[in-house]
Amino acid sequence: MATDDTSVSGVAGRYATALFELARDQKSIDAVRADVDKFAALLADNPDLVRLVRSPVFTAQEQGKALDAVLTKAGITGITANFLKVLTANRRLFAVNDVIRAFRALVAKFRGEATADVTVAEPLNDKNLDALKASLKSVTGKDVDLNVKVDPSIIGGLIVKLGSRMVDSSLRTKLNSIKHAMKEAG
C-alpha cells in the first residue's frame, strides 16, 4: 500500500491508491496531480461533464468516447488519461470525485502536507487562499493543501475541516446560534 498510516477505503480508496502507486513508481506524482486537478476543475465548471460522469444511462462506450474528447481538449494525457479510461471501462467513473479526494490525500501525506476541506460562500481570490494556507500552516506546522467547495447557503464566512478538527465560522451557524439564544430567552 501507499503509506502505512494513510487510510483510504472502499472503491475510491483502492483506485486512488493504485493511481498514487503508479505515479510514484513512474516518478510523476507532480504531473499526475496537475492532471487530476485539471480534471477536477473541469468537473467543477461543467455540469454536462458531471452528468456524463454520474449518469448510469450512458454506456461505458459512450462515456469513453466523450471522455476521450474531453481529455484531448484539456491536454490530459499519460497516466491520468489512462487511469480515467480504466475507471470508465470498469463503470466506476461515478466515483471519480471521491477518487480525486483520496488521491490528493495520499499525495499530501507522501509530501508531509495536511489537507483541509474548506467551504466558502463565494470563491476565494488568490490573496485570501494564500492567507488561509499561511494561517493553517502556523497551526499545523505543515504545508496545507486546500480542497475548496463553494456553498452559498453558508451565507458568509467559512468552514474548515482539517483532520479531526473543524472550525465553523459561517454566518449561517452564527445566525442559527442567535436564533436559538433568542428562543431560549423569550
Swiss-Prot record:
One of its GO terms (cellular component) is plasma membrane. GO terms for molecular function: proton-transporting ATP synthase activity, rotational mechanism. Coiled coil: none annotated. It holds the Pfam family OSCP. Keywords: ATP synthesis, Cell inner membrane, Cell membrane, CF(1), Hydrogen ion transport, Ion transport, Membrane, Transport. Its main location: membrane. InterPro entries: ATP_synth_OSCP/delta_N_sf, ATPase_OSCP/d_CS, ATPase_OSCP/dsu. The keyword Hydrolase does not apply. It is a peripheral membrane protein. It is found in: Cell inner membrane. F-type ATPases have 2 components, F(1) - the catalytic core - and F(0) - the membrane proton channel. F(1) has five subunits: alpha(3), beta(3), gamma(1), delta(1), epsilon(1). F(0) has three main subunits: a(1), b(2) and c(10-14). The alpha and beta chains form an alternating ring which encloses part of the gamma chain. F(1) is attached to F(0) by a central stalk formed by the gamma and epsilon chains, while a peripheral stalk is formed by the delta and b chains. Belongs to the ATPase delta chain family. F(1)F(0) ATP synthase produces ATP from ADP in the presence of a proton or sodium gradient. F-type ATPases consist of two structural domains, F(1) containing the extramembraneous catalytic core and F(0) containing the membrane proton channel, linked together by a central stalk and a peripheral stalk. During catalysis, ATP synthesis in the catalytic domain of F(1) is coupled via a rotary mechanism of the central stalk subunits to proton translocation. HAMAP family: ATP_synth_delta_bact (MF_01416). This is ATP synthase subunit delta. The gene is atpH.
